[in-house]
Protein backbone atom coordinates (compact mmCIF):
# COMPACT_ATOMS: atom_id res chain seq x y z
CA UNK A 1 0.00 0.00 0.00
CA UNK A 2 1.00 3.62 -0.44
CA UNK A 3 -0.31 7.12 0.11
CA UNK A 4 -0.65 9.90 -2.42
CA UNK A 5 1.32 13.04 -1.66
CA UNK A 6 -0.66 16.06 -2.86
CA UNK A 7 1.41 19.15 -2.09
CA UNK A 8 2.40 21.54 0.61
CA UNK A 9 3.42 25.18 0.77
CA UNK A 10 5.21 27.40 3.24
CA UNK A 11 3.94 30.93 3.69
CA UNK A 12 6.53 33.55 2.68
CA UNK A 13 7.00 34.83 6.23
CA UNK A 14 7.95 31.33 7.45
CA UNK A 15 10.34 30.37 4.68
CA UNK A 16 13.99 29.74 5.52
CA UNK A 17 13.20 28.36 8.98
CA UNK A 18 13.42 24.67 8.10
CA UNK A 19 9.68 24.13 8.42
CA UNK A 20 9.41 22.40 5.05
CA UNK A 21 11.86 19.72 6.16
CA UNK A 22 10.02 19.25 9.46
CA UNK A 23 6.65 18.95 7.70
CA UNK A 24 8.06 16.43 5.26
CA UNK A 25 9.56 14.25 8.00
CA UNK A 26 6.23 14.19 9.84
CA UNK A 27 4.44 13.30 6.61
CA UNK A 28 6.89 10.43 5.97
CA UNK A 29 5.87 8.81 9.26
CA UNK A 30 2.34 8.20 7.93
CA UNK A 31 3.39 5.59 5.38
CA UNK A 32 6.68 4.15 4.14
CA UNK A 33 5.57 4.24 0.48
CA UNK A 34 4.62 7.55 -1.12
CA UNK A 35 3.79 8.76 -4.62
CA UNK A 36 2.89 12.04 -6.30
CA UNK A 37 2.23 13.76 -9.59
CA UNK A 38 3.73 17.13 -8.96
CA UNK A 39 4.80 20.47 -10.30
CA UNK A 40 8.37 21.37 -11.22
CA UNK A 41 8.81 23.26 -7.93
CA UNK A 42 7.46 20.40 -5.80
CA UNK A 43 9.61 17.87 -7.66
CA UNK A 44 12.71 19.94 -7.00
CA UNK A 45 11.98 19.80 -3.26
CA UNK A 46 11.04 16.11 -3.18
CA UNK A 47 14.24 15.06 -4.98
CA UNK A 48 16.22 16.62 -2.13
CA UNK A 49 14.62 14.01 0.13
CA UNK A 50 15.55 11.05 -2.06
CA UNK A 51 12.46 10.79 -4.22
CA UNK A 52 12.78 9.17 -7.66
CA UNK A 53 11.05 10.64 -10.72
CA UNK A 54 9.68 9.15 -13.92
CA UNK A 55 8.14 10.66 -17.07
CA UNK A 56 6.84 7.54 -18.88
CA UNK A 57 3.16 8.46 -18.51
CA UNK A 58 2.01 11.26 -20.79
CA UNK A 59 -0.97 13.55 -21.08
CA UNK A 60 -2.05 13.14 -24.70
CA UNK A 61 -4.03 15.68 -26.71
CA UNK A 62 -5.35 15.62 -30.26
CA UNK A 63 -7.01 18.82 -31.55
CA UNK A 64 -9.59 17.98 -34.22
CA UNK A 65 -10.77 21.51 -34.91
CA UNK A 66 -7.97 23.95 -33.93
CA UNK A 67 -10.12 26.91 -35.03
CA UNK A 68 -12.29 26.54 -31.94
CA UNK A 69 -9.26 27.21 -29.75
CA UNK A 70 -9.00 30.74 -31.15
CA UNK A 71 -11.76 32.95 -29.66
CA UNK A 72 -11.94 35.34 -32.63
CA UNK A 73 -12.27 32.56 -35.20
CA UNK A 74 -14.58 30.59 -32.94
CA UNK A 75 -17.04 33.48 -32.77
CA UNK A 76 -17.11 33.69 -36.56
CA UNK A 77 -18.60 30.17 -36.67
CA UNK A 78 -16.64 29.11 -39.73
CA UNK A 79 -18.70 26.02 -40.50
CA UNK A 80 -17.07 25.50 -43.88
CA UNK A 81 -13.58 25.53 -42.37
CA UNK A 82 -14.74 23.23 -39.58
CA UNK A 83 -16.11 20.70 -42.06
CA UNK A 84 -12.97 20.93 -44.19
CA UNK A 85 -10.68 20.28 -41.23
CA UNK A 86 -12.77 17.32 -40.12
CA UNK A 87 -12.78 15.92 -43.64
CA UNK A 88 -8.99 15.90 -43.90
CA UNK A 89 -8.53 14.45 -40.41
CA UNK A 90 -11.22 11.85 -41.07
CA UNK A 91 -9.44 10.53 -44.18
CA UNK A 92 -6.76 9.05 -41.93
CA UNK A 93 -9.17 7.39 -39.50
CA UNK A 94 -12.18 6.67 -41.70
CA UNK A 95 -13.66 3.23 -41.13
CA UNK A 96 -16.81 1.33 -41.96
CA UNK A 97 -16.48 -0.70 -38.77
CA UNK A 98 -19.08 0.25 -36.18
CA UNK A 99 -18.14 0.85 -32.56
CA UNK A 100 -20.68 0.40 -29.78
CA UNK A 101 -21.45 3.51 -27.75
CA UNK A 102 -23.28 3.51 -24.39
CA UNK A 103 -24.36 5.97 -21.73
CA UNK A 104 -22.99 4.79 -18.39
CA UNK A 105 -26.11 5.53 -16.36
CA UNK A 106 -28.33 3.05 -18.20
CA UNK A 107 -25.72 0.44 -19.09
CA UNK A 108 -23.48 0.15 -16.06
CA UNK A 109 -24.08 -3.61 -15.76
CA UNK A 110 -22.52 -4.21 -19.20
CA UNK A 111 -19.42 -2.35 -18.12
CA UNK A 112 -19.29 -3.90 -14.67
CA UNK A 113 -19.56 -7.46 -16.02
CA UNK A 114 -16.73 -6.88 -18.49
CA UNK A 115 -14.61 -5.11 -15.88
CA UNK A 116 -14.86 -8.14 -13.62
CA UNK A 117 -13.24 -10.41 -16.22
CA UNK A 118 -10.83 -7.89 -17.73
CA UNK A 119 -7.22 -8.81 -18.41
CA UNK A 120 -4.94 -7.37 -15.75
CA UNK A 121 -1.41 -6.20 -16.27
CA UNK A 122 1.25 -8.82 -15.61
CA UNK A 123 4.14 -6.39 -15.98
CA UNK A 124 6.09 -6.37 -12.73
CA UNK A 125 8.51 -3.69 -13.90
CA UNK A 126 6.31 -0.86 -12.67
CA UNK A 127 3.64 -0.29 -10.05
CA UNK A 128 -0.07 -0.62 -10.82
CA UNK A 129 -3.24 0.51 -9.09
CA UNK A 130 -5.55 -2.17 -7.72
CA UNK A 131 -9.05 -1.57 -9.05
CA UNK A 132 -12.17 -3.64 -8.32
CA UNK A 133 -15.92 -3.43 -8.92
CA UNK A 134 -16.48 -1.35 -5.77
CA UNK A 135 -13.96 1.16 -7.03
CA UNK A 136 -15.64 1.21 -10.46
CA UNK A 137 -19.07 1.91 -8.96
CA UNK A 138 -17.69 4.64 -6.72
CA UNK A 139 -15.68 6.29 -9.49
CA UNK A 140 -18.46 6.27 -12.08
CA UNK A 141 -21.90 5.85 -10.53
CA UNK A 142 -21.18 8.15 -7.59
CA UNK A 143 -19.50 10.71 -9.81
CA UNK A 144 -21.30 14.11 -9.76
CA UNK A 145 -21.16 14.30 -13.57
CA UNK A 146 -22.02 10.67 -14.38
CA UNK A 147 -24.64 11.89 -16.88
CA UNK A 148 -21.70 12.91 -19.09
CA UNK A 149 -19.82 9.61 -18.81
CA UNK A 150 -20.08 7.03 -21.60
CA UNK A 151 -18.20 3.99 -22.81
CA UNK A 152 -17.22 2.45 -26.13
CA UNK A 153 -16.88 -1.25 -26.92
CA UNK A 154 -14.96 -2.79 -29.81
CA UNK A 155 -13.95 -6.47 -30.01
CA UNK A 156 -14.23 -6.83 -26.21
CA UNK A 157 -12.06 -3.74 -25.73
CA UNK A 158 -13.64 -1.00 -23.64
CA UNK A 159 -13.01 2.72 -23.23
CA UNK A 160 -14.67 4.80 -20.52
CA UNK A 161 -14.95 8.41 -21.66
CA UNK A 162 -16.16 11.78 -20.41
CA UNK A 163 -17.79 14.06 -22.98
CA UNK A 164 -18.46 17.67 -22.03
CA UNK A 165 -18.13 21.26 -23.15
CA UNK A 166 -15.65 23.72 -21.70
CA UNK A 167 -14.82 26.40 -24.27
CA UNK A 168 -14.66 23.54 -26.78
CA UNK A 169 -16.33 20.13 -26.96
CA UNK A 170 -14.04 17.58 -25.33
CA UNK A 171 -13.82 13.80 -25.24
CA UNK A 172 -11.60 12.63 -22.41
CA UNK A 173 -10.61 8.96 -22.58
CA UNK A 174 -10.53 8.00 -18.91
CA UNK A 175 -9.74 4.31 -18.93
CA UNK A 176 -9.28 1.46 -21.42
CA UNK A 177 -9.13 -2.28 -20.88
CA UNK A 178 -9.90 -5.56 -22.65
CA UNK A 179 -11.39 -8.92 -21.73
CA UNK A 180 -9.63 -10.74 -24.55
CA UNK A 181 -6.96 -9.80 -27.11
CA UNK A 182 -6.01 -6.14 -26.82
CA UNK A 183 -6.91 -3.90 -29.74
CA UNK A 184 -6.15 -0.65 -27.94
CA UNK A 185 -4.76 1.17 -30.97
CA UNK A 186 -7.73 0.17 -33.13
CA UNK A 187 -10.08 1.18 -30.31
CA UNK A 188 -8.46 4.63 -30.16
CA UNK A 189 -8.69 4.97 -33.96
CA UNK A 190 -12.41 4.15 -33.95
CA UNK A 191 -13.01 6.59 -31.10
CA UNK A 192 -11.18 9.26 -33.10
CA UNK A 193 -13.37 8.55 -36.10
CA UNK A 194 -16.47 8.75 -33.90
CA UNK A 195 -15.26 12.04 -32.41
CA UNK A 196 -14.76 13.58 -35.85
CA UNK A 197 -18.29 12.61 -36.87
CA UNK A 198 -19.83 13.92 -33.65
CA UNK A 199 -18.37 17.43 -33.55
CA UNK A 200 -15.76 16.76 -30.85
CA UNK A 201 -13.07 19.44 -30.93
CA UNK A 202 -10.35 17.75 -28.89
CA UNK A 203 -9.42 14.25 -27.71
CA UNK A 204 -7.57 13.83 -24.42
CA UNK A 205 -6.05 10.86 -22.59
CA UNK A 206 -3.40 9.85 -20.09
CA UNK A 207 -1.41 6.77 -21.04
CA UNK A 208 2.12 5.34 -20.86
CA UNK A 209 1.78 3.42 -24.15
CA UNK A 210 4.09 4.37 -27.02
CA UNK A 211 1.75 2.77 -29.56
CA UNK A 212 -0.61 5.74 -29.86
CA UNK A 213 1.71 8.06 -31.78
CA UNK A 214 -0.35 7.59 -34.93
CA UNK A 215 -3.24 9.31 -33.14
CA UNK A 216 -1.76 11.86 -30.74
CA UNK A 217 0.83 14.24 -32.26
CA UNK A 218 4.04 14.29 -30.24
CA UNK A 219 4.02 18.09 -30.20
CA UNK A 220 0.95 18.05 -27.92
CA UNK A 221 2.24 15.34 -25.54
CA UNK A 222 2.99 16.47 -22.02
CA UNK A 223 4.86 14.05 -19.71
CA UNK A 224 3.44 13.76 -16.20
CA UNK A 225 5.98 14.42 -13.47
CA UNK A 226 5.60 11.29 -11.36
CA UNK A 227 7.69 11.00 -8.21
CA UNK A 228 7.90 8.32 -5.55
CA UNK A 229 9.71 7.42 -2.35
CA UNK A 230 9.91 4.28 -0.24
CA UNK A 231 11.91 3.22 2.78
CA UNK A 232 12.16 -0.22 1.12
CA UNK A 233 14.89 -0.27 -1.55
CA UNK A 234 13.17 -3.04 -3.57
CA UNK A 235 9.88 -1.16 -3.69
CA UNK A 236 11.63 2.09 -4.58
CA UNK A 237 13.34 0.30 -7.50
CA UNK A 238 9.91 -0.62 -8.90
CA UNK A 239 8.43 2.82 -8.23
CA UNK A 240 11.38 4.36 -10.05
CA UNK A 241 9.95 2.85 -13.26
CA UNK A 242 6.74 4.80 -12.82
CA UNK A 243 3.09 3.99 -12.28
CA UNK A 244 0.60 2.58 -14.78
CA UNK A 245 -2.11 5.24 -14.52
CA UNK A 246 -4.77 6.59 -16.84
CA UNK A 247 -7.01 9.65 -16.87
CA UNK A 248 -9.49 8.08 -14.46
CA UNK A 249 -6.80 7.95 -11.75
CA UNK A 250 -6.04 11.67 -11.66
CA UNK A 251 -8.04 14.77 -10.81
CA UNK A 252 -7.12 16.43 -14.12
CA UNK A 253 -10.37 15.38 -15.78
CA UNK A 254 -12.44 16.69 -12.87
CA UNK A 255 -10.54 19.98 -12.85
CA UNK A 256 -11.45 20.51 -16.51
CA UNK A 257 -15.14 19.94 -15.81
CA UNK A 258 -17.55 22.83 -15.28
CA UNK A 259 -21.13 22.12 -14.15
Kindly label every feature range from the protein language model.
Residues 3, 18-22, 37-41:
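Residues forming well-ordered secondary-structure scaffolds
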Residues 79-106, 130:
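A conserved mid-domain beta-alpha-beta active-site/ligand-binding segment of alpha/beta enzyme cores
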Residues 17, 108, 210-211:
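Serine-centered coil/turn micro-motif
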Residues 10-30, 181-194:
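Conserved acetyl-CoA-binding loop-helix of GNAT-fold acetyltransferases
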Residues 1-8, 12, 103-179:
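A conserved beta-strand-loop-helix scaffold within acyl/acetyltransferase catalytic domains
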Residues 28-33, 155-156:
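Short glycine/proline-enriched coil/turn segments at helix->beta-strand junctions
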